[in-house]
Amino acid sequence: EEGNPEFIEQQIGQILRRADLQTKLHGKDVLPLSGEYTADVVVKGLVDFLSQNKPGGIDLEKLLDQAASMETAKDNAINALEEKLPARPPGFCTGCPERPVFSAIKLLKEEVGDIHISADIGCHAFGTFEPFSMGNSILGYGMSLASAAGVRQIQKKRTISIMGDGGFWHNGLQSGVLSTIFNKGDAILIIMQNGYSSATGQQFIPSSINMNNEQTASNQIEKALKSVGVKWMKTVRTYSVDVMLKTLREAMETNYDGLKVIIADGECMLARQRRIKKTNAKRLAEGQKVAIPRFGVDEEICTGDHSCIRLSGCPSLTIKPTSDPLRVD
């Protein structure tokens, strides 16, 4: 149980004592109070627990040797590298449909200046990292629009709230959209419609497409928004950065002073790849032709200004030296 206080441990302890059971309970005595429980941390905790209690039926010496060999193998792998591996901070997946949306917001900020952005829990929370660095707050799952209400009155520009479609169904529709409509809030909401709760493994949500690649009409986000009184609403394909920028600009400048919702539509690329992989395999088995697109950089057109890195942090690029004196690389 990561974090402190150890809620589950305390509750189980109370249950045991109320039942007058003297069963020993271990948790934070062998695991750290803070930090992420990585594999190394869990192994160390288990070794400490078994060393203290020495349960029957377990060859403790063999277990300790195994743990030591794991640590040795890790050290050997590190020493085998000529240089330390570069840090790999968390970020959007390759091809993620949400990355271009943040590129559009970045371009918007270059035009209008700083904007208060209320972030949310989900894949889009990676927008708080470089090269975007967007998100003044993250309050809770589906709470971005509700949290923006607390600062909206002191901002010189309209606030932008970002939430995923999973967060929208979980909490955003009630606490955010309904509340903003009721209080006549003048705000902008971007809903990342990727079709799943992607950050936790592409679980299905009410607006997910079904097995026939069709969306259930009664559970569409657009219909839900209209039913609660949203008047200003646009749906934009996430990869169309120019259209997204134009729509964001319109939302910032329009005279309409109610809630403005932009649905950024783009299926989670991981889920899409898994889905079409089965379809392509079936077509190949039937002897049909399957075309797989490939993308690259045209060296004759590229100016080497690194806009692809500065604006989107594209993870698929590799920079190499160039013989062209007019370009850095």
Regions found by a protein language model. Give the residues of each.
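Terminal amphipathic helices with adjacent charged low-complexity linkers/tails
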Residues: 1-68, 260, 264-267, 271, ...
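Short beta-strand segments
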Residues: 1-2, 63, 118-120, 162, ...
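Thiamine diphosphate
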Residues: 128-261, 269-275, 281
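Gly-rich Lys/Arg/Thr-decorated short loops/hinges at beta-loop-alpha junctions or inter-strand turns
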Residues: 23, 80-89, 125-134, 157, ...
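Short connector loops at secondary-structure junctions
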Residues: 28-35, 120-128, 194-200
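Active-site diphosphate/adenylate-binding microenvironment
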Residues: 63-145, 154
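Iron-sulfur cluster-binding cysteine motifs and their immediate structural context
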Residues: 272-273, 303-329
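Hydrophobic alpha-helical scaffolding
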Residues: 2, 6, 28-40, 86, ...
